[in-house]
Amino acid sequence: MTPWPSQREFSKRAFELSQTRRHLEYHPGTNPPSFTAVVEEVTDEGGVILSESWCYPRGGGQPGDTGVFIIDGKSFPFGEVTATQSINHPLLKSGLANGDEVTCVIDRDRRNSLAKMHSAAHIVSAVANERWGAITVGNQLNIESSRMDLKFENRELFDKDQLTEDANYWVDEDVGINVHQWGRDQIMTDDRVRNKR
């Protein structure tokens, strides 16, 4: 028989289920604005769980946001945001407490660099699919460089110089990028979506 959770465990579980993950409601995009939230918990490991967060957590090959909390003129930087049940903002110096209202400033330069890299990854993925029927099966994006794992129908036909030339063609054309707020059902039924795993 599973024992009843303690009051602290129960409260924590209830909060974890209710934390508002704003990045899921609206694509994080570029130039994220600052936002205000309440510190719901400072974890034993030194992380901060907020009442709501616009920070994008690490996952799926995409690095998480970093930034700084500001309260009463004091700055508290946080490292790369992660998520399990809640979005965790790991503090790089202590000093925040439960109930503090903080302004969260996301590192815009980092977010914007990652957004560019993310767009470039989509271009490379599309070019590899169009030219060789390749499917992107994994990736690890970063600010300076990224890795993409491509699965080819016939690996022998692949030419990295051709891939570079094709991808740069689309970059040089300065083609606009559209961001859609689609649910899974729409994604899975749209013919333009290449990889529907």
Segments from the language model and where they lie:
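Active-/binding-site microenvironments in catalytic and ligand-binding cores
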Residues: 2-197
